[in-house]
Amino acid sequence: MIKLLTSQKIIIASILSKFLIFFLGKKKRKIIRNKINYLIDLNEGIDLGIFLNIKNEKKIYNIKKILKNEKNTCLIDIGANIGSVTLPLAKLFDRSSIISIEPTKYAYNKLKLNLELNSKLKKRIKTFNYFISNNRKKVKYVHSSWNFSKDESKHKIHFGSLKKTSDKSVSLDNLIKKIKKKINFIKIDVDGYELEVLKSGYKFISKYRPIIHIEFAPYLHKNFGYSTDELINFIKKKIHYDFYNENFKKVKNVATHVAKIKNRSENFFLINKKDREKFKD
């Protein structure tokens, strides 16, 4: 299967967006997908994906095969954006609660609106407009929310618009201290900031070994002052996790595999070496 570059996906999505807006009229509209209500803007990438029922992270829901749907358990969505994963996870794990974290004020406001449209799911979702970091030096702006309008501040490769982040920055370890439930799954989609997020949750991750679903965007890592090799080494040697693809097949030569990810991103499941029996190699 041909894997498109991020820029190619955005160009195709932009053409589709213009086509739909021309024929349907309104950019903003309420829709229902898989019995979940959304308020979307057809001029934005994630929203368009929801409208077309294209789930870029659809294989994340394979986690249902190995993760129990239990009371008093919690799943964490870091980089929740408008709720495209938070809401389906809440529907899929209807006995669990969801912690939904989005750093940009723009996307967070859209997330809250989408939760209001889903009152039953909302009861089990706790949201935070926090920037998750191990570094006290706060990142004030990040490229996020893929708007198809022209904007000179957009990222040169993935075309994300520059958005202001929350004034509140917290480590994952400190945030988790406030949660009185068992956390067995963490989803991380932070556009290159993966190492900082993992470091900020080092104590918790090392002790409790949650399953992690992570988006790897190697072309963005240098923007945050680290190399992809540093991230791989932290995962394999510091927190002692192995890499699996989204069909639960172990990635044996991670460095070689990741080196082939050029100007795009790829998702992985991470699982602690002590828990490898949960996956089939």
Regions flagged by a language model, labelled:
Residues 80, 130-134, 190, 216:
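Hydrophobic pocket-lining residues within nucleotide cofactor-binding pockets
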Residues 103-104, 146-152, 219-220:
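Conserved short loop/turn motifs at secondary-structure junctions
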Residues 52-76, 138, 153-208, 220-226:
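Short internal loop-to-helix segment that lines adenine-nucleotide cofactor pockets
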Residues 90-100, 174-281:
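Conserved acidic-Pro-Pro-aromatic motif
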Residues 46, 107, 134-136, 218-220:
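Feature marks short, surface-exposed loop/turn motifs that line or immediately flank catalytic pockets
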Residues 1-170, 179, 243-253, 257-281:
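S-adenosyl-L-methionine
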Residues 22-27, 137, 237-238:
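A short, compositionally biased
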